[in-house]
């Protein structure tokens, strides 16, 4: 059986490490993680409100918002602030908290 090594390091927990509306900071250029059930995603190390740093998955929607704000080169995102949005959504037939990420001045469509 072919297995892939999963991404190392501690991952953030929405609602514990940060809350809706918090401002975090991107600390690296990110890396692609194709483990898991929902396809490839970008993982960035971020600085949390308590000054700790942990890994955070950026979904495709979040990536698109950040590309609009900061450009297509993730190396240039290092040191940039991001705003986290925690939204209850139906995922795999159950309500779950989904984290979206934008630049601080951006709004999520439908969340104005």
Annotate each predicted stretch with a short phrase.
Residues 1-55:
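OB-fold ssDNA-binding interfaces and closely related basic DNA-contact patches used
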Residues 1, 5, 106-112:
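Acidic, gly/ser/pro-rich intrinsically disordered tails
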Residues 38, 76-78, 93-95:
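A short, structural micro-pattern
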Residues 89-108:
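OB-fold/S1-family single-stranded nucleic acid-binding modules
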Residues 59-68:
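Short, structured beta-strand/loop micro-motifs enriched in basic residues and often containing a Trp
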Residues 68-83:
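Short nucleic-acid-contacting surface segments enriched for D/E, G, S/T with interspersed K/R
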């Amino acid at each position: 059986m072919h297995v892939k090594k999963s991404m190392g390091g501690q991952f953030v927990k929405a609602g514990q490490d940060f809350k809706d509306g918090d401002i975090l900071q991107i600390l690296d250029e990110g890396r692609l993680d194709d483990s898991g059930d929902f396809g490839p995603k970008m993982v960035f190390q971020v600085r949390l409100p308590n000054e700790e740093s942990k890994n955070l998955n950026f979904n495709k929607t979040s990536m698109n918002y950040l590309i609009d704000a900061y450009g297509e080169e993730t190396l240039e995102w290092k040191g940039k602030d991001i705003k986290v949005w925690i939204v209850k959504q139906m995922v795999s037939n159950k309500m779950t908290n989904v984290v979206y990420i934008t630049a601080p001045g951006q709004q999520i469509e439908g969340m104005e």
